[in-house]
Amino acid sequence: MEIERLDEADAVAVDREQADNHGVAPPETRDQQAYRTEYRVTVEAAYTWDAAALELRQAWEAHETKWPSPEDADRDGDRSLNPEANAEVERGCGHIREIAENVITPAMRAIESEDSDRHLIGLEHCLKGMDRIKEKIADAVRYKGRAPEEALETLKDVVRFTFCYSEERYTSGVIEDCQRLLDRGFQPFDRLNSWQAEQYKGVNSRWRDPESGLLFEVQFHTRASFEAKQLTHAAYERLRDPATSDVERDELQEFQRKASAEIPIPPNVSDIEDYSPEQRRG
C-alpha cells in the first residue's frame, strides 16, 4: 500500500475552511493532533524504509551474481519420502487443512474485523505448501531421525497468519490482538519479541486450538518489517543450508543485519513481553 507524503499546503487549506468569520481557525482536538502526529510518523517511516529497500534489493541481486544458487538436486540431495511416509504426511496435512479452513481462519477473520487500523496479510498463503512440508519432513527424517508423523507435529509454521500494523499503532495493536486470541479460546503456547534482534524484527507467537490440539503461528509486523522478512527470506534459506560456505554465510548474515537495521522501530515495542512454555507450565 502506497502512502502519500503529507502536504503542508493541504493541511493549511483544511484549516482555512474551518476558520470562523474572524479568520481564526478552531483549535485542534486531542484526537486530531494525535492523528496528525501518527500520520507524519507513518509516512516518514514508509519513506525511510522504501529508500533502504531499494538499495537492499540491489545488494541481494549483486550477492546472487557473486554466489549463484546451486541446482536443487546438487544442494538438497534426496528429499523424497517413501510411499508409506508420503501417504501418512498427506493424511496429516489434510486434517490440518480442514481445521485451518473451518476453525482457525474464520476466527482470525473475525478478530481482524474488530479493528480497521490493521489487517491480515498473505492470508492466501496461511497454509504451507504440501511440497515444502514434505521437504521439511524429509530433512527431519534424514538429519534428526524423526518419524514422519513426529516431524509433522513439530513443524512450527504449517499454519501461519500475519497481522500488519502502522508503527504508531503497533504495540497497542499487538497486545490487543493477543487478548482477542485469548478471548476466542485459543491457548498461548509461546511468544518472542525480536525487535531488538540483529537479523530479524517482529513478534512471533504460537497458539493452540484447544479442541483439535493444532498449533498455529501468528506473526505481528509493520509493513517495513514484513517486507524485510520477505526480502531476506532467500538469505535465511541459504543460511539454513549445510552446504553454504562459511564465507558466504558471513555475507548473508551481514545482509540480514543491514536489512534489519533499516526497519523503523515502533514506539514502546519493549512493552510486548515474551511468553515461554515454562511460564505456561508455571
What is each stretch, according to the model?
Residues 2-154, 242-246, 260-282:
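Charge-rich, low-complexity segments
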Residues 145-282:
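Long beta-strand-rich cores associated with HINT superfamily self-processing modules
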